């Protein structure tokens, strides 16, 4: 009985550690995107999303393609 409880607790700890890693990485990526700007000729979103660096504007080239251009 003790072995089953120990195995259950270890499994729960491993599962929680595996589940926590992608969430932390996702938060880190979104913070980096919000803080930075996009350089010339990078994909952007005119309505939301990362902003282009100063002097550049997000221009819609087609329905599926918007880029930071001067």
Swiss-Prot record:
It is found in: Secreted. SUPFAM superfamilies: omega toxin-like. Residues 1-20 form the signal peptide. Keywords: Amidation, Disulfide bond, Knottin, Neurotoxin, Secreted, Signal, Toxin. Residues 21-34 form a propeptide. GO terms for molecular function: toxin activity. GO terms for cellular component: extracellular region. It holds the Pfam family Toxin_7. Expressed by the venom gland. The modification Leucine amide is found at residue 69. Coiled coil: none annotated. Disulfide bonds join 37-53, 44-58, 52-68. The presence of a 'disulfide through disulfide knot' structurally defines this protein as a knottin. Insect active toxin causing rapid but reversible paralysis in crickets. No activity shown in mammals. Suppresses the excitatory postsynaptic potentials evoked in lobster neuromuscular synaptic preparations, possibly by blocking the presynaptic calcium channel. Induces instantaneous reversible paralysis when injected into crickets. Does not show effect on mammalian Cav2.1/CACNA1A, Cav2.2/CACNA1B and Cav2.3/CACNA1E. Belongs to the neurotoxin 01 (U2-agtx) family. The primary structure of the mature peptide is identical to that of U2-agatoxin-Aop1a (Agelenin) from Allagelena opulenta (AC P31328). This is U2-agatoxin-Ao1a. It comes from Agelena orientalis (Funnel-web spider).
